[in-house]
């Protein structure tokens, strides 16, 4: 599973998820990508479940790129613990994903296989998603 090797602070503020992603909106490595349509935290377990779903469906072919990483820790207090007495212990790691961010990319397989693999992965994630195709750069242009 994905976890940071080391962090400066074990406990972080929750933060805000306002607006769309600043970068990572285009498919850069593969031919197809899975784009988030809403902002959310995605845990390292959800990322791993999506990766396993894609790679199992594709069998031995193709390549998967994971474009998000769980840098942020989240905390939780035990069940039945009263309010107060400090912040809880770190419970896991999440990736902060804003809308329009490409989370996964697939290359080296046919369009049907890529679309089905990304569809299976989308069911493992807590956000609405859409499958996007790579924009070909430097092709025919009908500008002046």
From Swiss-Prot:
Instruction: Set out the biological process GO terms recorded for this chain's protein.
Output: translation
Q: Which GO terms describe its cellular component?
A: cytosolic large ribosomal subunit
Q: Which domain of life is it from?
A: Bacteria
| Pfam family for this entry, one | Ribosomal_L16
Keywords from the UniProt entry = Ribonucleoprotein, Ribosomal protein, RNA-binding, rRNA-binding, tRNA-binding
**Family designation:** Belongs to the universal ribosomal protein uL16 family.
Summarize the protein's role: Binds 23S rRNA and is also seen to make contacts with the A and possibly P site tRNAs.
Under what name is this protein listed? Answer: Large ribosomal subunit protein uL16
Q: Which organism is it from?
A: Latilactobacillus sakei subsp. sakei (strain 23K)
């Amino acid at each position: 599973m994905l976890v940071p090797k080391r962090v400066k602070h074990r406990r972080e503020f929750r933060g805000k998820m306002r607006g769309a992603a600043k970068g990572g909106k285009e498919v850069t490595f593969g031919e197809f990508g899975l784009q988030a349509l809403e902002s959310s935290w995605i845990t390292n377990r959800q990322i791993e479940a999506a990766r396993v779903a894609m790679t199992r469906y594709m069998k031995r072919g193709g390549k998967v790129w994971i474009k998000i990483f769980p840098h942020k820790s989240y905390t939780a207090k035990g069940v039945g613990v009263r309010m107060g007495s400090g912040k809880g212990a770190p419970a896991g790691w999440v990736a902060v994903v804003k809308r329009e961010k490409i989370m996964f990319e697939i290359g080296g397989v046919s369009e049907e296989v890529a679309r089905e693999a990304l569809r299976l992965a989308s069911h493992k994630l807590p956000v609405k998603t859409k499958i996007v195709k790579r924009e070909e750069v430097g092709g025919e242009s009908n500008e002046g």
